[in-house]
């Protein structure tokens, strides 16, 4: 099924890495080898998305290292120095602003921009997100500049440590309790984000950091692109206890489409139907409520189920949600309204 009820349901997708890919210059007109671009967004009914800027570490491993105990672990990437990260992130953000200048997207700076995009008229809306805050100086002097430019979402860490906290490494099987949490600079960062109106994303933060953010009560807790740890025991997924806290704060989990975080064995190869995405969504909904479930594909950052392939077939995911019992109204909430509510809570609290 390519649509729900014979029409495209508007979708807000909570995470993609398109701006960081080598073929980023094809985002406007189409990227044959990419998972997300403007034509694919339109075909899939994606009227809004969070676009991440991210600085890759030099020499990152592509494959996990098996430990003597059988656990799979990716070597934790080294921290990127602030000057290099700031330059890299600024270049990637500039690509988004160029798309805005040329009329291909509208960069969201207020909740009204999200609302205006849902009708399907005009350009889709893009939320600028910094994934891993090495691009921000520990004194936070540059954060106001980033906010003025359009930054509205930030993850304090990627899956490595930095001045703000400790990322959760990619380990399977493992809990997300992999070390210490936020530093004093990280606590100050979260507080300043809340003051400005920048959503704080927890998807790459370890469990100690998650609870540090929860104690600050800065806003609804958000894991923009994660799965349910009960279904796949990867360290990057969210435990039941974390889910309960996300629900209690009015937050959400954007269900990730990355095959390893969906399969119970963490493998990229083998059977990976779209139904796995729906299974994680169903689990989270049954645990804490449909209002806390959203979508966070990680397009262009991870392998996705082959039957999905790319953003042009996003409506297939909504069809899979219907197959596991989500009603039409619930699908619309998962596809759009839940993200809209949480973004509004963070942005209007400032």
What positions do the PLM features span?
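N-terminal hydrophobic targeting/anchoring segments and the immediately downstream early-domain regions
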Residues: 1-176, 233-295, 299-350
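Divalent metal-binding pocket/active-site signature
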Residues: 134-137, 146-236
